[in-house]
Amino acid sequence: FCKVHICERWEEGRPLLRRELNDADVAVVGSYFSDGVAAANEVLDSAALVKAFYDIDTPITIAKLQAGDEEYLRRDQVPQFDLYLSFTGGPMLREIENSFGARRVVALYCSFDPHRYRISEMDSKYVCDLSYMGTYAPDRQAKLEALLLRAAQGVPDKTFIVAGPQYPSEVSWPKNVKYIIHLEPKFHPAFYCSSRFTLNLTRKHMVKVGYSPSVRLFEAAGCGAAIISDGWAGLESFFHPNDEILLDESTAEVVRYLYEVSPEEAAGIGKRAQQRVLAEHSADKRAAQFEELIGAKSLARQYA
């Protein structure tokens, strides 16, 4: 349904981009692209009917612009886009409008593929009481140690699994914690479906601004996982606490969930979370939102 062109150098990509822009109805530039400033100029100078910037790193982008860092987007380019789409919602949207002069700022959150992330058969390799999937991140590690590793040390009768690369060799894994350095995406559904609960931890800059759900959060919910998550502003607009997701702020709280929430209750939480993301956060839902935002029906009428 699409063409993908991969260019090693911007000099190779520029002529191709210009050709594609000649008859483009909509042109979108993504964030954290090393030649983003040059690409944005090409888009803004084009005849595309709708010119948009899609920021999947909104807190980082805004922090950079505030510091005068224009690595992939210039401050003066922001007001020139017809539409500024953001992975982050909430108050930050108004800040982009008020401080940077964006014409129209709208949250277009991440999404998940329900054909890949769905309820799967359990796999004995991943059966445990609490799982966590995530690449090592220094600003998340303290939470992982408090909410999983310390919990594991205190409940030797429970089992835990951590999956993700780049964890330092000095990390001390308790005996009842299994560490998997890499898990292929095709095994993700079985991973989520084989643990009683799965833990969601959020990067510090995303917690600070709030309204920044991760792809992993939606993918886990798509698999019907009972999610235990750290809290952040806006989380309740994606999942109802204690009904579709459980919130934790301490080791003791995690341990309490492990002992007091029955398998049936956990399954119910996971099922309701799955229903929520299927209704609101699947890839097709997000595509429909995008089409509505760019006025796809109006564009189509011009060619009728």
Where are the language model's segments positioned?
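Conserved catalytic-core segment of nucleotide-activated headgroup transferases in glycan assembly
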Residues: 113-197, 207
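Proline-centered loop/turn at the N-terminus of a beta-strand
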Residues: 49-50, 83, 104, 159, ...
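Carbohydrate-associated surface elements
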Residues: 108-111
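Catalytic binding pocket for nucleotide-activated donors in carbohydrate/polymer assembly enzymes
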Residues: 1-9, 55, 61, 103, ...
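Extended catalytic core of nucleotide-activated donor transferases of GT-like folds
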Residues: 1-96, 100, 115-116
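Structured loop/turn residues at beta-strand edges in well-structured enzyme cores
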Residues: 22, 46, 79, 100-103, ...
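Short, polar loop motifs at secondary-structure junctions
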Residues: 56-58, 88-94, 164-170, 230-234
